[in-house]
Amino acid sequence: SVVKSEDFTLPAYVDRRDYPLPDVAHVKHLSASQKALKEKEKASWSSLSMDEKVELYRIKFKESFAEMNRRSNEWKTVVGTAMFFFGITALIVMWEKRYVYGPLPQTFDKEWVAMQTKRMLDMKVNPIQGLASKWDYEKNEWKK
């Protein structure tokens, strides 16, 4: 029981749009009916029926160009998998916000930010191009 591996030094069959005529036929070992059809192929092609021509094509090629160009539904799997992982990530983030992170510091409150901004304006921080340059100290409001 010796397993014989395929010899990869020989040309292999492949269906590709950019390589339309592979070096070898799709069917390597012909049956008796296929051998008879190959003999009939050597005669005039007008004597062959449409089914025989299709069978000869299928011996040489696995897929036609129309079958190779047919759209696959693989995009649905990709989008579904991406959405699944986005959902898992959203659940993890929600769990972390609820159970891992503490409350926000007081410096994030709107009142605190307003007091800090007022303090910076009173100190005239960065009066040339910064915050203080945009405040009108005479009218006590932001410049327009």
From Swiss-Prot:
Residues 100-144 are mitochondrial intermembrane. SUPFAM superfamilies: Mitochondrial cytochrome c oxidase subunit IV (SSF81406). It is found in: Mitochondrion inner membrane. GO terms for cellular component: mitochondrial inner membrane; respiratory chain complex IV. The chain crosses the membrane at residues 74-99. Pfam families: COX4. Gene3D superfamilies: Cytochrome c oxidase subunit IV (1.10.442.10). Its main location: mitochondrion. It is a single-pass membrane protein. It comes from the Eukaryota. Pathway: Energy metabolism; oxidative phosphorylation. The modification N6-acetyllysine is found at K4, K28, K35, K42. Component of the cytochrome c oxidase (complex IV, CIV), a multisubunit enzyme composed of 14 subunits. The complex is composed of a catalytic core of 3 subunits MT-CO1, MT-CO2 and MT-CO3, encoded in the mitochondrial DNA, and 11 supernumerary subunits COX4I, COX5A, COX5B, COX6A, COX6B, COX6C, COX7A, COX7B, COX7C, COX8 and NDUFA4, which are encoded in the nuclear genome. This is Cytochrome c oxidase subunit 4 isoform 1, mitochondrial. It comes from Theropithecus gelada (Gelada baboon). The gene is COX4I1.
